Amino acid sequence: MMKLMLFSIIVILFSLIGSIHGADVPGNYPLDSSDDTYLCAPLGENPFCIKICRKHGVKYGYCYAFQCWCEYLEDKNVKI
């Protein structure tokens, strides 16, 4: 029981440290030619969003809030 409690405390501490010092990666929602965001599902890593982000000139993206989000997408590259 004591080992389980100690393990749980360690996991919680590492989770807190990761959320405090975690990298906040900049990015943007890419827009199509009609100034609309690209809708997506399922949430998380999504092949469609990765493809869209590559069209916008960045390497990685994912589905967040049912819209594609591209990491490191600058404001000037948002619209195709």
UniProtKB/Swiss-Prot annotation:
Xref: PROSITE patterns: LCN_CSAB
SS bond list: C40-C63, C49-C68, C53-C70
Keyword set includes Secreted: yes
GO cellular component annotations of the record: extracellular region
Gene3D superfamilies: Knottin, scorpion toxin-like
Coiled-coil region(s): none
Keywords, ordered alphabetically: Disulfide bond, Ion channel impairing toxin, Neurotoxin, Potassium channel impairing toxin, Secreted, Signal, Toxin, Voltage-gated potassium channel impairing toxin
Biological role stated in the UniProt entry: Inhibits the vertebrate potassium channels Kv1.1/KCNA1 and Kv1.3/KCNA3 in vitro with an IC(50) of 5.3 nM and 50.0 nM respectively.
Misc. comment: Negative results: is a weak beta toxin because it has no effect on Nav1.2a/SCN2A voltage-dependent sodium channels when perfused at a concentration of 100 nM, but when added to the extracellular bath solution at a concentration of 1 uM it shifts the voltage of activation toward more negative potentials. Has no effect on the Nav1.5/SCN5A voltage-dependent sodium channel. Administration to mice produces no toxic effects.
Family to which this protein belongs: Belongs to the long (3 C-C) scorpion toxin superfamily. Sodium/Potassium channel inhibitor family.
Protein name: Beta-toxin KAaH1
